[in-house]
Amino acid sequence: MQYLVFDIETAPEPDDVLEGLFTFDESAVKNYRLLTTDFDPGEVKLGNMKDPAKIEAKIEAARLKFTMDKAAVTDQIETARMESWQTFQDRAALSPLTGRVLAIGWWNLDTSNTFVAHVDGETEPITENVLIENFLCMADAVLSDGGSLIGHNIIGFDFPFLLRRGLKFGIRPPKTIVNALAQYRPSNLIDTMREWQFGNRAEGFVKLDQLAAFFGTQRKTGDGADFHKKFFGTFEERQEALAYCRNDVVMTAEIAAKMRLIAMPAKQAAAQSESPPEPPKQEEPQREHNAAPTVAQQDDIY
């Protein structure tokens, strides 16, 4: 049986896109009502005051406090807006509505190599839609041939993300994948997170690195939240990001083997555990304009 282990890496949409999707309710900020009202001297509590000078002084003090409080609310709203925007940006990569696919790593256990295909802006870009369509075609072929797809939270995250982003580009979801996702426990989608739950879904999410620590297998080499920052950073940082994706694929395969979900040949496991060679620092060759690369043309992990 053919086994394909995979993992996707996502990023927030560009800021100009996110700005059109971001919403903020400033009325929820404390004392927001001050911005919609004017100072009313009649609301100042004077008690038994009789002295006009003291009355005027108290009213002026109240007016000054109202003005300062109103200015403070404006500052609070701006601070709250910035914090909300930052949270929105930080979580954007987790939703197909606000995020995009940057890279997909996979490993066909019948072979000895892992691969990472990714969008690329150095020359003619491999676009997100090409990346998704090529991978879904490959996944569909594996399932159609009776094989299985393996990943961590692929039922709850990876596949829904890929399929929904694919819809944005007019990519028809493969029936093999849709039908598998519709099953309570699809036999051809091996999700290490679901398998770890043993039916207790109320237990919630378990991180891949937690399972790696538990089983004593390869650990994370970075933080997924930093993937897009490194990917769009220097050449060296991009290589680190792609190596991180590759490592996640190997981690998943090792954990699946530890859970007795698959049998991974020892020599392949050992080969994948070795660090990839340092990539040569050279520019990529110019691609023919508008040429859509196939899966086979996607970049190896270097």
Stretches with model-predicted labels:
Residues Q2, T98-P125, L143-A266:
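Metal-dependent phosphoesterase core characteristic of DEDDh/y 3'-5' exonuclease domains
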Residues Y3-R164:
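Conserved non-catalytic scaffold segment of RNase H-like nuclease domains
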Residues F22, M264-Q272:
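Short, glycine/acidic-rich hinge or "gate" loops at secondary-structure transitions
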Residues P125-V130, P277-E283:
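Short, mixed-charge aromatic SLiMs
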